[in-house]
Curated annotation (Swiss-Prot):
The lineage of its organism: Eukaryota, Fungi, Dikarya, Ascomycota, Saccharomycotina. SMART domains: ERCC4. This is Crossover junction endonuclease EME1. The gene is EME1. The keyword Transport does not apply. Interacts with MUS81 to form a DNA structure-specific endonuclease with substrate preference for branched DNA structures with a 5'-end at the branch nick. Typical substrates include 3'-flap structures, D-loops, replication forks and nicked Holliday junctions. May be required in mitosis for the processing of stalled or collapsed replication fork intermediates. May be required in meiosis for the repair of meiosis-specific double strand breaks subsequent to single-end invasion (SEI). Its cofactor is Mg(2+).
């Protein structure tokens, strides 16, 4: 009579081999009314150690089934009852040990037969694997809820080093449907199989967001003109032109047309005079008033007569403000500028201030103020800059100040050398004699660094002069530039500064220079074309008619490439389009 196999429990963790259990259940399926539900997810995920008893008993069980079906039925019932007791007693223990420390004690590197076939693992995992939301709950399997639970994974159960991780990754990587992660901090974060278990999903800033809805928004400037980048915008263009053109006024189309018609019929000469661009420096300085602070004007007392002569016909006056050695520029305005229509219309006499100002400092005095009271100096300069002034900082005697600093450095160096040669008492007495009384706390190298810093961080334009005479003789040039900038076409038409603009004497010269520029045509060939077509209008007329005139020798007047380029010029509506 065959012996009854015994199940030996080793380390409270050993179970029967899966192949043996499946063989017994499949052979005696008719005798078992309600098969006991077994948690096969744990069976698949954890290979148990010391399973020698089950392996040795598998042979005897196979022999016993051949001898008597009744004995086999009783044996199967006994084994199932013992197995139920083992599972009910040890299931909670095995689930509590789902940690990295517990796995080496209960498992080995041996792979079960059921895990060798990846396709079988995938099929069984799709039907059986489900993970609870808490480690303290029992892992259950239900045919009705199995598919729903496989579609949701709680964040607490997503552990990289969990023993069930091997099965879960196999399921999620091959899953065709989308996976939905539910967590307290990230509600309904939807992702596909390509983005499954993505770290970027867990670190999203928004609590509810879809991957397709993620967009990156750039912070826009509060300045509307800067956001639109439209140089034709009146507000943005006014802000730019106001720095150079004084007395700007916005008027409507009707008002501009009425003023223009009135002045053309009644005061045409006055209208032309206020719109004439001064080309002479003497003419440009007529309406300029140069305002000197009292201290600066008295400091340049010896240069006053020279200033009056070289700045003429500009007016020199004394300012009422004397906080800084400052020079300001004013203009006598007899007209206002219509920004929308680019006209200067005559108006009542008015004095306006230009945006350029000059600060004239002795180099030593400036760096002493910078070293002792930097904050006060910075606040005064920023107060001037707040009114949209272009500040020019003029320093004189900078080379002299550098030589003085170099001399101080040399004296200090000699003192250190002598202190090492002689004893301390002699060096102390000698230092009292040789050390200079004024130490500015600067080196020659520091001066250049400070000037670069002030130019970059404070926004000042720095100009160096060697003497008062150099500064005085440089003022007329600056005064002329300020006098011309209000009428300068390059400033008024800055919206077209990106275009390559060239001037011509007449229509024929304009056509000749255009052909020479766009077609790289030599001057002789361009002159031959302009002799036949005296203007763009005549050339356009023949282009529209579809027939161009021939040259004097009977050949084509221009090449096919030049014809295409001219045709693009005539038909294009985009001024920025390239002419190929």
């Amino acid at each position: 009579m065959p012996t009854t196999p015994v199940i030996e429990i080793l380390d409270d963790s050993s179970l029967l081999d899966d192949s043996l259990i499946e063989e017994i259940i499949s052979d005696n399926n008719d005798n078992v009314i309600h098969p006991t539900e077994i948690d096969e997810s744990i069976e698949i995920s954890i290979p148990y150690v010391n399973d020698k008893t089950a392996e040795s008993n598998s042979t005897s069980l196979g022999n016993s089934q051949k001898e008597s079906s009744l004995i086999v039925t009783q044996t199967a019932s006994q084994r199932k009852r013992i197995l139920d007791e083992i599972l009910s007693d040890d299931l909670s223990i095995s689930t509590d040990d789902f940690s990295l420390d517990a796995i080496p004690k209960q498992t080995s590197g041996r792979t079960r037969d059921s895990q060798k076939n990846d396709s079988a693992l995938y099929e069984s995992s799709q039907e059986k694997a489900s993970i609870a939301s808490s480690p303290n709950r029992l892992i259950k399997k239900s045919s009705s809820e199995r598919h729903k639970k496989s579609q949701s994974i709680d964040s607490k159960d997503i552990c990289i080093k969990s023993p069930t991780r091997k099965i879960n990754l196999g399921v999620t990587e091959s899953m065709q449907t989308d996976v939905l992660f539910e967590d307290n901090n990230f509600n309904n974060i939807e992702c596909t199989q390509e983005t499954d278990l993505s770290f970027s999903t867990a670190t999203a800033d928004t609590p509810t967001v879809g991957f397709k809805e993620i967009t990156f928004k750039h912070k826009e400037s509060t300045n509307e003109g800067l956001n639109s980048h439209n140089f034709s915008d009146s507000i943005f263009e006014r802000q730019r032109l106001k720095q150079y053109i004084t007395n700007i006024r916005d008027i409507t189309e009707t008002e501009s047309q009425e003023l223009y018609n009135k002045l053309i019929h009644t005061e045409k000469g006055l209208f032309n005079a206020v719109n004439q661009t001064p080309r002479d420096n003497f003419k440009a300085r007529e309406d300029i008033i140069v305002d000197f602070s009292p201290s600066l004007l008295s400091f340049l007392d010896k240069q006053t007569e020279i200033l009056k002569s070289i700045l003429a016909p500009a007016t020199i006056q004394k300012s009422i403000h004397d906080e800084l050695p400052r020079i300001r520029f004013f203009r006598k305005c007899h007209s206002f500028y219509d920004l929308q229509h680019d006209f200067f219309f005559p108006s009542n006499y008015k004095i306006v201030e230009e945006n350029t100002t000059i600060l004239y400092f002795d180099s030593k005095e400036f760096f002493v103020k910078y070293k002792e009271d930097k904050r006060s100096l910075f606040e005064k300069l920023k107060e001037i800059e707040r009114d949209n002034y272009e500040i020019i900082l003029v320093l004189y005697d900078l080379a002299k100040f550098k030589r003085e600093l170099e001399k101080i450095e040399e004296t200090k160096y000699r003192s250190r050398v002598q202190s090492q040669i002689y004893d301390s008492q002699q060096s102390i007495q000698q230092n009292k004699v040789t050390t200079p009384q004024s130490d500015y706390g600067l080196k020659k190298f520091d001066v250049e660094q400070r000037l670069r810093y002030i130019n970059r961080e404070w926004g000042l334009k720095i100009h160096i002069v060697n003497s008062h005479n150099d500064f005085v003789h440089s003022l007329p040039n600056l005064c002329s530039i300020i006098g011309k900038q209000r009428m300068d076409p390059a400033i008024r038409y800055m919206r077209y500064a990106h275009l390559n603009v060239k001037s011509a004497s007449d229509r024929k010269d304009t056509l000749k220079k255009t052909i020479n520029e766009i077609g790289k045509v030599p001057d002789i060939k361009a002159s031959a074309i302009s002799d036949i077509y005296s203007s763009f209008q005549s050339l356009l007329h023949d282009f529209e008619a579809g027939s161009l005139k021939a040259s004097s020798d009977g050949n084509y007047l221009m090449s096919e490439a030049l014809e295409k380029r001219l045709h693009k010029i005539f038909t294009s509506t985009d001024p920025n389009e390239a002419v190929d």
